[in-house]
Every structure is written in structure tokens, then in C-alpha cells.
């Protein structure tokens, strides 16, 4: 556990502002909402504020009544919130939807190679045989949470297989950084940039494996997760900016600082628990708090980002609007600070 310095009361006030702004955004059942409400769920778990849980229940019940969309890898991100709702309320309808998403991932989602999940954002075959770092949060981490809860070894193995292959496909062994995506058809990383948020998806989800899988050391793939995260975080500390943040293209000093990536990376450092990272998390806290407005908006968050064609494609993604993933990753980080 890292020994971090912060004002707990101030932290609770900031979390409350971000939660309330997030719940007022009218997000729909897709991955931005999935990440956002994962963050709200974490805030509830860490603070015990029942009002946050009630907000989620009210939103979910209304949306379920209105009708749910088709499942994709991205829409499975909503499963994180549903796990919390089921655990806290015992209402079977939430768990039924969780298991519907699991059934989609296990039996219907597009895969390639050694059973690797293809990243999907719609019911179409959008990105044939492409692995994106995003998939780890939206599907693999979700599958791991359900598998460990049910003690379902096949599900756990499937989740860990996703981690293993995403590490092999996306991590650059020389730098330790992660590429945004991998194209199995062309056997390349497409434009080949180290996108900040991709590294946050990788680092954050890897930092969760030991937390959820108590006997992790009995699974060989977890050694890959442990070493991948070690090398990645060691590299990431070297490109933290003077403001305590990370850039949207990690190794490009002309690309802007991006707050959602910074939140995910700093949260991964907290969860990984290496005391050598204390000063980097402390610095990140200041930088992140400086980008949260009085009304709970997390600022400096890049818009939705495909695997762009060139460096300017990443540099020019707007960061003028609040986003569900920015709100959610900020809440995940701030909630982990309460440890």
C-alpha cells in the first residue's frame, strides 16, 4: 500500500461533485456509460454513500424498462455496474443481464487466432481480426469479475487468455508501452502509436487481476500480467509531465496532456502497490484535481478515439467536452486514493 498524502474530506467532496455531474449526463447504455458507472460504483463501494447506489438503481431500472440494445464488446462494459447492483440489492434481474452479457462474450462475440476477442462497437464486423486495448476493460476484466465470483474456472481461463494475448499483441517489449491496436490480418499495429488511454486500459485492468483473483499465483498467465504491468509502469513513470499527467501520445511532447489516461495510469500505480511509484501518484493527484471543475466536470479528456491513421489524428481529437470515460476513470482513481 502506498503512503499518500491527501485531505480525505476534500477527496469526498470532489468525488461527490463528480458523481452528481456524471449521473446528470443522460448517458446511454454503451461503453461511455459503462466506464462512467463503473466509477460511480467504485465511489459507492469506497464511500458507502447509499445515495450513489440509489441513483444507479433508478437509472438502470428505467433503462431496462425502456429496452436494452444489442450486445457488443463495448456494451458489455455496462456489466461492471450490474455486478455491483446485484451484489448490493440481490435483485435477480441485474444478474440475468450480467449472464446475458457473459453468454454473448463466451458464445457469440467475434474471435480470431487463439480465441482472442475482436473489438466490436456495433453488430457489424467493424474491425476484422483487430485487438484493441479497450477490450480488456469492456469485456476481459468484466469476464474475470464474473468468473471469480462464480468460481467458474473456464470463464477465468477465458478472461486470462484475453489478457495474455492482448499483452502479446499490444505491448512493445523494448519500450514497455502499449500500442492502441493490433491487426491480425496484416500482422501489424496499424499506425503504431503509444496512445495514452490504451495504456490506461491495459495498466488499470492488469492491476485488478491480483485483487479479484486471490490465488492468482496458480495461473501461469498471471505471471505475464505481473511482468507486463511491471515493465509498463516502469516506462510510464518516465513520461509523466511536469504537471503530473500523461500525454495522449505518450512519447510525443507536442501532443496534449490527457486526463482520463492519467487517471487510469495513476490508479494502476495505486493498485499495483510499488512504493517507488508513490511520488508519481502524488504528482498525478495534483494534476488531476486541477482538471476537475467546481461542478464536477473532469476536463482535458479526449473524445472517442479509433486507431487513428497518423500522429495528427491523435493530436487533433478534441478535448473540450466532458466524457463518460473521463468521469468514470477519475472516480476510479479518486476512490482508490481512499485506500
Regions found by a protein language model. Name each.
Residues 2-32, 41-46, 51, 62, ...:
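CBM-like carbohydrate-recognition segments
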Residues 89, 146-157, 209-223, 272-276:
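Inter-helical turn/loop segments and adjacent helix faces that build the functional surface
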Residues 116-182:
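Aromatic- and glycine-enriched pocket-lining scaffold segments that form the walls
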Residues 177-197:
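Acidic/Ser/Thr-rich, low-complexity mid-to-C-terminal regulatory regions of eukaryotic proteins
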Residues 203-250:
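Oxyanion-binding "anion nests"
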Amino acid at each position: 500500500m502506498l503512503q499518500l498524502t491527501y485531505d480525505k474530506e476534500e477527496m469526498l467532496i470532489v468525488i461527490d461533485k463528480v458523481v452528481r455531474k456524471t449521473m446528470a449526463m443522460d448517458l446511454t447504455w454503451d461503453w461511455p456509460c459503462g466506464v462512467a458507472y463503473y466509477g460511480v460504483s467504485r465511489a459507492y463501494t469506497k464511500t458507502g454513500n447509499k445515495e450513489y447506489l440509489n441513483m444507479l438503481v433508478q437509472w438502470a431500472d428505467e433503462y431496462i424498462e425502456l429496452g436494452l440494445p444489442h450486445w457488443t464488446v463495448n456494451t458489455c462494459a455496462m456489466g461492471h455496474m450490474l455486478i455491483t447492483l446485484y451484489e448490493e440489492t440481490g435483485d435477480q434481474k441485474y444478474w440475468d443481464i450480467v449472464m446475458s452479457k457473459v453468454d454473448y462474450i463466451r458464445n457469440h462475440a467475434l474471435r480470431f487466432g487463439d480465441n482472442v476477442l475482436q473489438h466490436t462497437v456495433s453488430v457489424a464486423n467493424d474491425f476484422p481480426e483487430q485487438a484493441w486495448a479497450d477490450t480488456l476493460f469492456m469485456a476481459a476484466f468484466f469476464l474475470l469479475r464474473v468468473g471469480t465470483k462464480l468460481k467458474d474456472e473456464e470463464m477465468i481461463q477465458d478472461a486470462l487468455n484475453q489478457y495474455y494475448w492482448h499483452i502479446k499483441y499490444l505491448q512493445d517489449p523494448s519500450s514497455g508501452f502499449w500500442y492502441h491496436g493490433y491487426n491480425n490480418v496484416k500482422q501489424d499495429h496499424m499506425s503504431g502509436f503509444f496512445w495514452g488511454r490504451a495504456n490506461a486500459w491495459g495498466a488499470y485492468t492488469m492491476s485488478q487481476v491480483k485483487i479479484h483473483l486471490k490465488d492468482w499465483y496458480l495461473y501461469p498467465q498471471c505471471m505475464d500480467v505481473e511482468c507486463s504491468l511491471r515493465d509498463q509502469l516502469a516506462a510510464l513513470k518516465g513520461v509523466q509531465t511536469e504537471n503530473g499527467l500523461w500525454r495522449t501520445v505518450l512519447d510525443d511532447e507536442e501532443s496534449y496532456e490527457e486526463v482520463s489516461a492519467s487517471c487510469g495510469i495513476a490508479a494502476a500505480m495505486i493498485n499495483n502497490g510499488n512504493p517507488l511509484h508513490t511520488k508519481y501518484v502524488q504528482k498525478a493527484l495534483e494534476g488531476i484535481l486541477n482538471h476537475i471543475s467546481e461542478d464536477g466536470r473532469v476536463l482535458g479528456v479526449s473524445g472517442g478515439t479509433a486507431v487513428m491513421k497518423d500522429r495528427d489524428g491523435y493530436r487533433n481529437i478534441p478535448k473540450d467536452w466532458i466524457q463518460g470515460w473521463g468521469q468514470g476513470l477519475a472516480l476510479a482513481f479518486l476512490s482508490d486514493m481512499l485506500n
